Structure formats: C-alpha cells, structure tokens
C-alpha cells in the first residue's frame, strides 16, 4: 500500500501547481487564498492564522535557510522532491512542511471537497480500484498515523 500511496502522491504533486513562482527558483511565501475564518466552524480563524503566520512561515523560512546553506537554492521544489532522500533532514522536513501547507491552503478551501474528476480520478481508480477504496485506505492511514502528521 505504501507504494500505491507514494505513486498517487507523486501524481498529485505533478497535477497541482500551487504557484508557478513556488515551483521554480526563488521560493516565495504564498498569500492565503481566503480569509482565516473561511473554514469555520470546522477550523477556527485563530488556528488558521497560527498555521499560516507561524507554522507555515517557519517551514518556509527554515527551508530557504537550509536550501541556501546546502547550496541547492537554485533547484525547484519539484527537483528537490524528486530526490528528497538525498538531502539533509532540514531540507526534507522544512521543505515538506512548506509544500504541505501550500497544498493544504488549496485543497481545504471553503468550496473544496467531493469527488475529484479527470486525471486525478483516473489515477485514484487505477491505483485503488475505486474512490470508496481510496477513502477507506486514506482514513485508515490517518487513523494509524503516530504522533503529529498528515495522511
């Protein structure tokens, strides 16, 4: 199952363009695409503000610092993630946090949700057999995640 999940994550990464500037040299800290309160009552404005201004910002700043110190700040996030295991933990962890938060802001929008379509749905069906099976495996991954983390 881990192989299927990794393949799907790689495919999703290739489909989602959070911000063209972010996917190239010269990393940028993206603007939040909606108000902090947009996900209430599910996620309150204070939590969103803390995640955006503190957590995401720290991941971004620490990633840029690590990329500069390791002389890889000329590489795009896409290039870094293609060989992520070759880089130090500071790049892997902060780069992952930086990207995951950008992804979060996009997929957790006030009008997001439901079943995908197009190439993403095709990839889910090819990988898991059905959207329902994907949901079940995704929920199981989330339930069994140790400590803090994302499924």
Spans of features found by a protein language model:
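Bacterial Sec-dependent N-terminal signal peptides
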Residues: 1-25
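Feature for soluble, non-membrane regions of globular proteins
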Residues: 22-151
């Amino acid at each position: 199952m881990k192989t299927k999940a990794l393949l799907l994550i790689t495919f999703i990464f290739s489909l989602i363009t959070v911000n063209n500037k972010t996917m190239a040299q010269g990393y940028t800290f993206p603007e939040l695409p909606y108000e902090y309160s947009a996900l209430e009552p599910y996620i309150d404005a204070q939590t969103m503000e803390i995640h955006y201004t503190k957590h995401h910002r720290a991941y971004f700043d620490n990633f840029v610092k690590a990329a500069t110190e390791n002389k890889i700040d000329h590489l795009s996030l896409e290039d870094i993630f293609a060989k992520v295991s070759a880089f130090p933990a500071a790049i892997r962890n902060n780069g992952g946090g930086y990207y995951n938060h950008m992804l979060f802001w996009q997929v957790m929008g006030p009008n997001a949700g439901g079943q995908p379509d197009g190439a993403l749905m095709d990839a889910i069906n090819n990988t898991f057999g059905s959207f329902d099976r994907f949901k079940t495996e995704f929920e199981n991954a989330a339930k069994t995640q140790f400590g803090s983390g994302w499924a």
